[in-house]
Structure formats: structure tokens, C-alpha cells
Amino acid sequence: MAQTEPVDWRIQLSGDACPLSVELKESTGLPWGCVVRPFASPREGTQLPVVSEKEVERCGNCYAYPNHLCTFEYRRWRCAICGNRNRMPARYTRQGDRARLPEFAGECYELDMKPTADDEVSFGERPAYIAVVDGSGDGDFMELVRSALSAAVSALEPTDLFALVTVTEDIGLYDLRAAVPAVRQVAVPSSGGLSVPLEELLPLGEALVQVGRYAETIKAAIDSLLAPEEMAAMEAAAGEVAAQHADDEAGESQVKEIPAEATAKRRVGFGAAVSAVVDLLSTAPSGASYAPRILSFLSGLPNHGAGSLRPRTSNGADGRRQKSTPSLKPATPFYRNLGRLCAERGICADLYIISHKGTDLGSLRPLCTLSGGVLHLYEPVAKEGWASVPQDVFNALSRKRAMQGMLRLRTSEEFRTSKAFGHLTPDSQYENLYHVTACDEGSSFAFDLDFADASTFASEEGSGRGSDDEDRGSASGGLRTPRIQMAFCYCARLQASKPPGAAGVEWRASPLVKRLRVQTVEFDVAKTPVEMYAGMVPEVILKLLVVSLFTTTIIVI
């Protein structure tokens, strides 16, 4: 799970130093890569310096951004990444002034950029949260969901909007404006779309209610979420009381058994429900600008209607059907297409799976990864860990989020990034540029590193690179210094300060900011296997191994 505490680093190498050469790297058998947290919070009590993008001169060769590792000479500044000499702008000419400029003051700073018209249109203003709950779960599942939703509501601002949807073989949309929460339902067909869109059951503006104003109604609706057997037991108890009064003359009491349908095989049209919610969110009236986030809770495979999944089976040696090996390859494109639709409409979809049985992560995962959401899986082998669900939901909604991000890593010429892992989408036009739909302070992405043509960080005489070695710095005698620069462009809304009595204050849009975060770091060079092993960073190595294993299992989406 992502970290909850602010971290002070944004680029972490798999070791304290880079391997000297290809031969050394291969002899150790260690992975070589890095993990970046582009939106990580700075150390508590500090802020990143900000400078206007118009005031910063980029390298004319590799387009890297100026940083604290750059060197200066007469009328020129040298790029710390590629060593290129660049024209000295007037802003950089005075040495005393240079030291105070944000881009040279430390290893990390931000460029302030002007949001475009497209940014304003696609980035919603008012936070709106829609909970989609699998109503077919057992008592343990529903108890966890009630606790998780209570935690979610407590993490929201009083002016945020909230809606509640349940799904079994019917979709239930709650009217949270009533004194007693009412549910309006529509059946999920076995195939095709709903007979009645959710908008006709309850318009979007009425389904979404303000958290602070309707807190009691929201709490009552959450408390009403019961498992089928719990609801059947309550109905049976009520029927028993009625039967006792009706049969007083017979002198015997009749106990009403729980209906068979209450304990029958679960049916849940999850895919149809999320699709219907996405359609409902698309009916926002003119002038309303929402930043929607769907919080889904699932107790097992969605097995009814659009997006239904089945347990994966294969033919055994005896010809009988048996469960196949778990796979992360999608069995259907439904959730991938739905995730792309969410991304197009600025909707983030989170999914919490709390299941006693296996689930088809390969099919469900794209809904989250493509929309910028997160997927949490709580398996039966670790049932004691289920208690963390409410806290996990609270943490996820409490973190700051960046949207519409673009991420690039630039490296010095001896090495390069070879693979990227995480919720990243490669740009179709520019190499090594990745799109990040959404991320928070704890989101991390992994990159494999590899040597380029040089195959070593050693600087040999006669190579023609001696002068560059001096400009680029030296890890030790005769070695070139490895450097990485991260550039992360994102949009976010500034957190508005709360005046006294904020619970009753009407909502006001927070200003949209667009920033480009730049961090440049350099590393030592390890010359022996002993230095490589001594400097290992286990958590980074483990992440690189895990994501590499996943990549060999799933289809790239």
C-alpha cells in the first residue's frame, strides 16, 4: 500500500551507487533501476521553491532544465545532464544573484505554468464521490463496507458531494435528500443496457448531496447496508411476530424460515452498475463542473449482466473441467474500455475487493489503472488484514492528488531508462514521455536502467571526452558522475483555507494550478561487487522484481 507519511525523496536508486560497467552489473545479478515518487510531499514545514516557466532557460541539446549541478563559464552555462554549452541569459549573469534563484538553490523546484483551456475544461472543479457497493456480500463484508464508507465520509470536506449506489441483480440509487433514505431500483438485464437510465430514476443533481448538510441522512443510508441473510433474518423475525398474533387461537407459533432466495448463489451486475454511474455523471447540467471519483466495493466476481466474469477453468488430464492457474491477462475488454471512458471523462475509479474467493484481477485491473484509480485486494489468507480497509479508504481520500500528469526521466549519456512500470501510458509521439492520469503523494513508478553505448562510467584517456568529464564532475578519479533528472508536469487544485464555521459555508471553486516539478540527483559509482551488495536498497529491489514479474504475466494495456 502507498505510504501515508510525507517522504523527502522522489528518486530512489536500487543501490547507493551505479555499477561501473555492464560486466560488473551482470556479475552481481542485481537489478539496476530506480523508483520515483513524482508527487511526494517535501519535508514537513518546508515548501518547494517556485519560478515562472518563462524565466527558465532549458538546454538547447537535451532540453534538460537548469539545476544546482550546472556549471558556469564566460557567457555560457553547462548542462549537468549532457554537458552542452548554452547561452547565458541575463538572469544568470551575476553570480551572487544566481545562488538565490530557485532553479539553482537546491535539487528540487517547480515551474509555474499557465493552465490551458483544455486543462480547465477537463479538470473538474467540485469533488464528487460515488460509492458503488456490492450488496450480495456476507455479513463480514457488509460490516467492513459500512465502516469503510463512514471513514470515507469523515475524510471529505463538508462541501464535497456524495452519492450511494448498491448493486446485486438490481441497481439501487439512494435518494439522500429524504428524511429517511429511499432507494430507487432498476433491474440489470443479463445482456445489453439498462431498461431505464439512472438519470430517470434520480437526476444527478439530486443524487449528489453535500456531505455537511446531509450528514445524518448519509449515515442512516450507510447503516442500512445489510447482507442478504441479515435482511432475510430481520424479515423472518418480523414475520414470526405477526404469525404469533395471527395464530393465537391455534395455540401454536410458527417460525418463518429464511427464504431460499436469500441464501442462493450471489448475482451482482457490477460492470453494468459502474457503466450506468459513468453515464449518470455525464449528464451534469451546463455550468456544473465535477471532479468525480467512484469508490467501488466488491465481494467476488461480477457474474451478471454487462462485464460479467466467470471462474477460469481448463481441461485437466482426465478431461474434466478444473480451475486454471490464476492469470492477469484480461478475459474481457469490457473493463479496459470502461477505464478508458472514465479517463476521457475525467472520472477516477477506485476498487476495493474483499473476497473469500479468487477474483479476476486481470480483467478488473484496467478499470483502475486507466482511470488513475487504485485497486486494493484483501485476500482470505490474510483476513486479519481486512480490519485495515476503513483506514486504507480514509488515507486514499485524504492525500493530495495530481491529475493529467506527464513524466520524463533524463539521464546522463552513459546510461538510460529501458523500461517503465506502473500506471503509465507511453506518449504516442515522444520517446520516454509518459502520461499519468492521476497520482497522489504515495504513488510510485519504477524504471529499469541500462547502459548506453559507453557501457561504462570510466573515462579513458584518448576518448575525446576529457573536458566533458571535468564539466560533468567526477565520482572519483577517472569516473563520470551518473545523473538523473525527473520532470513531472501536473495539474492540481490549491486547498482553500477554511474560515471559522466552515461546515456551513457554501462551496467555492479552488484555483487550478499547473506546475512542472524538476529534481536532479547524482550518484556514486560502485567499482566492485562488494560495493554493489553493501549498497543495496531492499525495498527498491523488491519493487523492481515484482513489477518485472507482473509484466511477464499481463498483457500491456
Predicted segments, located by residue:
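Extended acidic, low-complexity intrinsically disordered regions
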Residues: 1-557
